């Protein structure tokens, strides 16, 4: 049964719902990519698909727009797959369970993928709708944006004529983004040596955190579960001999982790528990505003896994304690804008290696490199190694932008007020595509999406309606 079929704009929501029936998390984009190609083929459009599953669909200009310069509509097909504790949904294999609650669209127990499925839905609807007037329309749908903009990095832009681009990957209506931070993922690998150790084995769990986007919400003071876990383990090791067995937390480096778990073997279980309980009470006070749901649990468990030896445990706890996290510098040019940050988004443990994955962001290239150097220096001092993956450049503000001025004028007429024009502390593909398309004039915008990258994600229906109207009018005036 179609859940969104009664919503307007009808085709935008229908296409979005069709997308949601197809699993399309990052690194799982072949099916959704093929679906986009089939959509274009059905309309008889010029289309391209590459090995990274990027898709380009091109529609000719509508009558009267043949001499107007081409316009690019751009978004990404992958979504962040997060779900509530206890949710049985296999997001690699199953579609989403959508619901409508008043003016909101959500997915039961999981992320919705409005970031950036709504861009795909609007772009495809614009291609299909014969009442939408536009120049040559070049729809660029990239993959794996959420794990380092990997699709955009390898996109062949040869088919593209446009040097004006509407990126529909912003989550707050009325804000036009015209610049963003650069960034990338840093993988810090620590080799592990394991040996027998007699004692009581405990499971330590941190849960109930708010989490959120590691770029635009990094300055909200929210706790990082991996950082809290490092503090707890350090406190326990201070009162009794402790060996780390495993530590895990988070699943996306660009999402602030909401939970983490570790297994340790200790000489004195009672002392370890008391130390954890004492620190947990202090942490709850620290985060009573930002993370009122913070919970710490310690319980006895059994494990067949060997713990790490004393030296390795010390190195692992040092890494968890000393890895920088959060806001590192604020912009001196734009009040209130984060300039440099990082997020320890993923912590995972294998038999012979522990890995912490950090999302590093900065609008200043030299500061981005400085943070990477810190991570490399610390990790190598502990005997580990570092890999940098998915590097992307900052998107620099363009002083002279005809597209921005056109969008401001349309917005003013439709809304009766001025839009907010800003740069953001988050990564957008505009920087990468701007490098490939010299002279690219680009603005990022979109409807209201709240709590993206979390199961609380919601898309606002009325905002989608207004944003669609804005998009259609901007296309109409693109000549």
Language-model features: locations:
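A structural supersecondary motif
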Residues: 239-252, 332-348
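Acidic/His- and Gly-rich active-site-bordering loop/insert found
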Residues: 2-103
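His/Asp/Glu-rich mid-to-C-terminal helical/loop segments that flank catalytic regions of hydrolases
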Residues: 222-239, 268-269, 315-321, 329, ...
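Active-site metal-coordination/substrate-binding segment of hydrolases
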Residues: 65-163, 198-201, 310-314, 321-325, ...
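A short beta-alpha structural unit
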Residues: 17-21, 250-252, 261, 295-307, ...
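Zn-dependent metallopeptidase/amidohydrolase metal-coordination segment
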Residues: 9-12, 332, 339-341, 345-352, ...
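A conserved active-site cap/scaffold subdomain adjacent to cofactor or substrate pockets
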Residues: 253-330
